[in-house]
A protein has these predicted regions:
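Domain-length accessory/inserted modules outside core catalytic folds
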Residues: 1-31, 38-129
Length: 129
């Protein structure tokens, strides 16, 4: 992983600036650990959720993150966009690290969504990415 971006990401996760959320890179509650990486890289690329046209439609409140051409795709609300993955020097849009007593490989989003704190995730990133 790009060492400069990694350092900024880890520092941001430990900063207390970000509220932790689950289920999306960013939503009305805050950020997933992967969303923090997007925000560290370029905080101006977030695209606010569009309210549903039909009141029966579910408004999940997920923000999209624009690509390099200021386009956005709905499939980039839960994992890193491809261009952020490449820029960061990661091999996957949802990187895996050894986690738990048995050291089983788990995705960062899964670790985030299952209750690990940003500080704990920062330690994992620092050690394994």
């Amino acid at each position: 992983m790009d060492s400069s971006l990694k350092q900024k990401w880890v520092r941001a996760l430990r900063s207390g600036k970000y509220e932790q959320a689950t289920g999306a890179l960013r939503n009305e509650d805050g950020f997933c650990c992967l969303g923090v990486l997007c925000d560290v890289y370029d905080p101006d690329k977030w695209v606010e959720p569009i309210p549903p046209l039909d009141e029966d439609e579910d408004d999940d409140g997920k923000w999209n993150y624009a690509d390099q051409g200021d386009n956005y795709l709905y499939d980039t609300t839960d994992v890193l966009p491809v261009h952020i993955t490449r820029i960061a020097g990661l091999t996957a849009q949802n990187p895996e690290v050894p986690y738990g007593i048995d050291g089983e490989m788990k995705s960062l989003a899964s670790i985030n969504d299952n209750g690990a704190t940003f500080a704990e995730i920062a330690d994992l990133i620092e050690t394994h990415l």
